[in-house]
Regions:
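Alpha/beta hydrolase fold serine-hydrolase catalytic domain that processes acyl esters and thioesters
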Residues: 2-24, 144, 151-154, 171-176, ...
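Serine-dependent carboxylesterase/thioesterase catalytic core
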Residues: 42-47, 52-54, 58, 64-77, ...
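C-terminal catalytic-base region of ester-bond hydrolases, centering on the histidine
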Residues: 174-227
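Flexible, membrane-associating and regulatory peripheral segments of lipid-active enzymes
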Residues: 1-44, 50-52, 56-61, 66, ...
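A broad, low-specificity signal for short, low-complexity segments enriched in glycine/proline
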Residues: 3-8, 32-33, 67, 136-145, ...
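Surface-exposed loop/turn and secondary-structure junction residues enriched for glycine/proline
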Residues: 25, 35, 52, 78, ...
Length: 227
């Protein structure tokens, strides 16, 4: 089956949906507070394309409050391989620095989830588990409305044989536990390429922009971490 990018209607709804999430966030405080408590493990959150640690501040703050030790990725703005290196070597070094007391759980938003999976494939000894949030790792990257922006921002061509080979490796079964949080109403990436048959998947109702702020997503992350 050939998968296509989300519809123009879903794409056009992205900003209004993100604004609605922010405007109504307070309504969900009781449900957020009732989520399972954490076990103190170290969690690193990797931001999406062209985003920084500021974009994951709400998620990190929430997970800190319920009992986890969270960290941003500390690499500035995410511009793909221009930021982390072709084999994510700079991100691996950051994870290694946090893993002195034991493997780290990686949560990646969109492109950040693809990077988290690459780290887990290359250095499974450093990674306890991977949670991806709206990360299009499991199918054609052209089943998105942002693939041209990806090529421009990262300097990579999606049809480059080396990029295709790396993408195929990232999509392969992980050597650590994994969960993919995805939405079929995502307006930027086709939700069907954000999860696969080999791993655990959790479907939510969300757009793509600001997905890491969505209370339903935060609760899904908390429940996944609690296992």
């Amino acid at each position: 089956m050939v998968l296509t990018p989300p519809s123009k209607a879903l794409w056009a709804a992205e900003l209004p949906r993100a604004a609605w999430t922010v405007a109504t966030w307070w309504r969900h405080r009781p449900a957020l507070a009732a989520a399972p408590r954490g076990d103190g493990r170290t969690v690193m959150i990797v931001p999406g394309l062209f985003n920084t640690d500021r974009s994951t501040a709400v998620m990190r703050g929430y997970l800190n409050r319920i009992g986890y030790r969270t960290s941003g990725w500390g690499l500035g703005r995410n511009r793909g391989v221009r930021t982390v290196g072709v084999e994510a070597e700079r991100l691996i070094a950051r994870v290694e620095s946090l893993a002195a007391a034991g493997p780290v759980t990686l949560i990646g938003v969109s492109l950040g989830g693809i990077m988290a999976r690459l780290v887990a494939h290359r250095r499974p000894d450093l990674v306890r588990a991977v949670i991806t949030v709206s990360s299009p790792y499991a199918g054609s990257p052209k089943a998105t409305n942002v693939w041209r922006a990806f090529e421009w921002l990262t300097g990579e061509r999606l049809d480059d044989p080396a990029v295709v080979l790396r993408s195929d490796a990232i999509a392969g079964p992980l050597p650590v536990p994994s969960t993919a949080i995805w939405s079929r109403s995502d307006g930027l990436v086709n939700g069907l390429i954000c999860h696969d048959a080999a791993g655990h998947a959790v479907e939510v109702r969300s757009g793509h922009l600001g997905v890491q702020l969505k209370p339903e997503v935060l609760i899904a992350v908390a429940k996944t971490l609690a296992g």
